[in-house]
Amino acid sequence: MERKSRDLTLVAVYASLYVVLVYLFAPISFYAFQFRVAGILRPGIARKRILAAGYAIGVAVGNIFSPFAGPFEFVFMPIMSLLAGSFGYLVARLFESDYFVAGAVIAAVISMSVSWMLSMLFNMPMLATLPYLFISEQMVCFIGAFIFKLIETRFRWW
C-alpha cells in the first residue's frame, strides 16, 4: 500500500508541476514555435514509468490555457504524451534509465505529434514546423535531463 501511495503522490506532484510551468510560461508554451518550459520534467520518466501518466495528466490540464483548446489539445496530445513517456521509459531502460535517452525519445515523439497536430489544425506543412519543434523540444529535454542528473547526485527522488 505504501508503494502505491508514494507513486500516486509522485504522479500528482509531477502533473501539478507540469501544469504550473505551462501556466507560468503560457506565452511561449503554445503556437507553432513553442518552447514549453514544462518539458524539463519529461526526462524524469526514465526512472519511474508511472510518471508517463502524470505527464499525460499535466498536458491535459495544462492545455486548458491553450488558445487552441479542443479535441487535439485535450485528447490527442495527452494520449501522445502518455505514449511518448512510456516509449521514452522503455528505451531509457536499455541505457540504465538514462535521463538524456528518455528525454531525446520523448522530445522526438512529441515534436512529431505537435507538428502533425498543427498541420491538421492550421494546414501548416510539417516540414516547416517539425525542424524548429524538434530542436526546441530536444533543448528543453536536454536541460531537464541535466537538472535531474544534478538532483540525483544528492537525492534519490524516485
Task: Describe the role of every protein-language-model region.
Residues 1-46, 50-53:
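Hydrophobic transmembrane alpha-helices
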Residues 1-4, 56, 122-126:
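Juxtamembrane loop-helix boundary motifs flanking transmembrane segments in multi-pass membrane proteins
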Residues 18, 55-63:
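Small-polar-interrupted transmembrane alpha-helices in polytopic inner-membrane proteins
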Residues 27-34, 64-158:
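Membrane-embedded alpha-helical hairpins and interfacial helices in multi-pass inner-membrane proteins
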Residues 45-56, 92-101:
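Membrane-helix interface "capping/anchor" motifs
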Residues 46-48, 61-66:
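Interfacial segments of multi-pass membrane proteins
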